[in-house]
């Protein structure tokens, strides 16, 4: 058996490695390694869409809340408080309305029923309300003055009306005209106008006729191809009975009560209505304006709708078939008690559709004209709340149970 020493084996290998290095058999050189290659690249966070609300008390619905327990002790006072407030407010409104004086006179058949001399107006044509003279019933009078030079036979001439006010009317004094059975809320009617014309633009026929929604159909141009200005059904049917700028004092003509047609419309409309850019050769008045413009437009008579407040008022259609619109006003002077005369030029026919037209004279109040509706609604609401409080009190006293009565628990009622 050959003796084999492991230590000699290790020596042999060490000599071999050493000889390899000396003989030039160099091992492959290791590639240089850049430490920066092992550094992690900066990773930019990617924002993902998240519809989750913010983490706060409001968006997460963690706000402090009160969940009251409704008991007769809390509900009864609440009903009573609401009843008292509603009754007080309703009473104040009715008291304010009861102090409003007004004169209403209808004159639609003045041309056919009134004579050339003064006569009493039928009782169904007028209504006077004076809070200091509740039984006042002196009938107003009228007479008709014909104008044979006017070829328009449906409505012509002047209707003269006399009425007496037994007490002063404090300013502001408002003179309105009233129309009944005139359906100004018809869909085709309220959409028949041109906003471009109202804003002063010289809109073409295609613009006023073919616009989607609001347009001037069926009154866009006349037989000569001229565009109606202003076009549409609303402008064409404008109320054109004429009213003077004063109430004539019958007893003292030197003390007439002055009126004005300025300040009768909303201030906001002054920014909407502008003077037109049309040339008079491009346009024609609407068909029903024939009495106002018998020879059409010229260089000087094109209406300036920016300052024509009666027209601006008319272009705001009423919501119902009864319309009341302001035509004259006096903001400075009290209307003294006395007999006054109002001369109305007749131009606007109503008998063809069984309508009515009249005047409405009032001084109004801080809450508007004489209308008890709102006050009555408040009183009814207050009475309902009081009745609910009484019913709840009755059930509580005679049909209720003790609060926190242990005998009413289900396991104690077996």
From Swiss-Prot:
GO CC annotations on file: cytoplasm; endoplasmic reticulum; Golgi apparatus; phospholipid-translocating ATPase complex; plasma membrane
Superkingdom of source: Eukaryota
Residue numbers spanned by region Disordered: 20-52
Membrane side Extracellular: residue ranges: 96-372
Consequence of substituting residue 110 to A: Strongly reduces interaction with DNF1. Mildly resistant to miltefosine. Decreases protein level. Normal protein level
Phenotypic effect of disruption: Resistance to miltefosine (cytotoxic phosphatidylcholine analog) and sensitive to duramycin (phosphatidylethanolamine-binding cytotoxin).
PTM annotation (Phosphoserine): residues: 36
Annotated GO biological process: aminophospholipid translocation; cell surface receptor signaling pathway; phospholipid translocation; regulation of vacuole organization
InterPro entries named among the record's database cross-references: CDC50/LEM3_fam (IPR005045)
Compartments it resides in: Cell membrane
Membrane topology value: Multi-pass membrane protein
Disulfide bonds listed in the record: 110-159, 216-231
Additional record remark: Present with 2460 molecules/cell in log phase SD medium.
PANTHER family from the UniProt entry: CELL CYCLE CONTROL PROTEIN 50, PHOSPHOLIPID-TRANSPORTING ATPASE ACCESSORY SUBUNIT LEM3
Its biological purpose: Accessory component of a P4-ATPase flippase complex which catalyzes the hydrolysis of ATP coupled to the transport of glucosylceramide, phosphatidylcholine, phosphatidylethanolamine, and small amounts of phosphatidylserine from the lumenal to the cytosolic leaflet of the cell membrane and ensures the maintenance of asymmetric distribution of phospholipids. Contributes to substrate binding and specificity of the P4-ATPase catalytic subunit.
Protein name according to UniProt: Phospholipid-transporting ATPase accessory subunit LEM3
Source organism of this protein record: Saccharomyces cerevisiae (strain ATCC 204508 / S288c)
Lineage of origin: Eukaryota, Fungi, Dikarya, Ascomycota, Saccharomycotina
């Amino acid at each position: 058996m050959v003796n084999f020493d492991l230590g000699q084996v290790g020596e042999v290998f060490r000599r071999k490695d050493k000889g390899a290095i000396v003989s030039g058999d160099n091992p492959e050189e290791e590639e240089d390694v850049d430490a920066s290659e092992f550094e992690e690249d900066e990773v930019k966070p990617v924002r993902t869409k998240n519809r989750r609300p913010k983490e706060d008390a409001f968006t997460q619905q963690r706000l402090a809340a009160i969940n009251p327990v409704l008991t007769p002790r809390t509900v009864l006072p609440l009903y009573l408080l609401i009843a008292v407030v509603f009754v007080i407010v309703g009473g104040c409104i009715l008291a304010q309305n009861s102090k409003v004086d007004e004169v209403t006179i209808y004159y639609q058949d003045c041309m056919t029923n009134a004579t050339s001399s003064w006569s009493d107006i039928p009782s169904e044509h007028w209504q006077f309300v004076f809070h200091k003279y509740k039984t006042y019933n002196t009938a107003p009078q009228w007479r008709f003055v014909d104008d044979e030079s006017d070829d328009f036979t449906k409505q012509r001439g002047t209707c003269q009306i006399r009425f007496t006010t037994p007490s002063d009317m404090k300013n502001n004094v408002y003179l309105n005209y009233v129309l009944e059975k005139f359906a100004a809320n018809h869909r085709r009617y309220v959409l028949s106008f041109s906003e471009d014309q109202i804003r002063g633009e010289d809109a073409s026929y295609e613009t006023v006729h073919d616009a989607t929604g609001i347009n001037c159909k069926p009154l866009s141009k006349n037989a000569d191809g001229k565009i109606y200005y202003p076009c549409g059904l609303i402008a064409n049917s404008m109320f054109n009975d004429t009213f003077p700028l004063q109430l004539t004092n019958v007893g003292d003509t030197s003390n007439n009560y002055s009126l004005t047609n300025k300040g009768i419309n909303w201030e906001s409309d002054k920014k909407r209505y502008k003077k037109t850019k049309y040339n008079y050769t491009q346009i024609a008045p609407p068909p029903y304006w024939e009495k106002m413009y018998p020879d059409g437009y010229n260089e000087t008579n094109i209406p300036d709708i920016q300052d024509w407040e009666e027209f601006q008022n008319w272009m705001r259609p009423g919501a119902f078939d009864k319309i009341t619109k302001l035509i004259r006003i006096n903001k400075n002077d009290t209307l003294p008690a006395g007999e006054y005369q109002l001369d109305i030029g007749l131009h606007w026919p109503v008998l063809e559709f069984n309508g009515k037209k009249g005047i409405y004279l009032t001084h109004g109040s801080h809450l508007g004209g004489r209308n008890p509706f709102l006050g009555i609604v408040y009183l009814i609401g207050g009475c309902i709340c009081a009745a609910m409080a009484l019913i709840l009190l009755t059930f509580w006293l005679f049909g209720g149970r003790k609060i926190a009565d242990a005998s009413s628990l289900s396991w104690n009622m077996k």
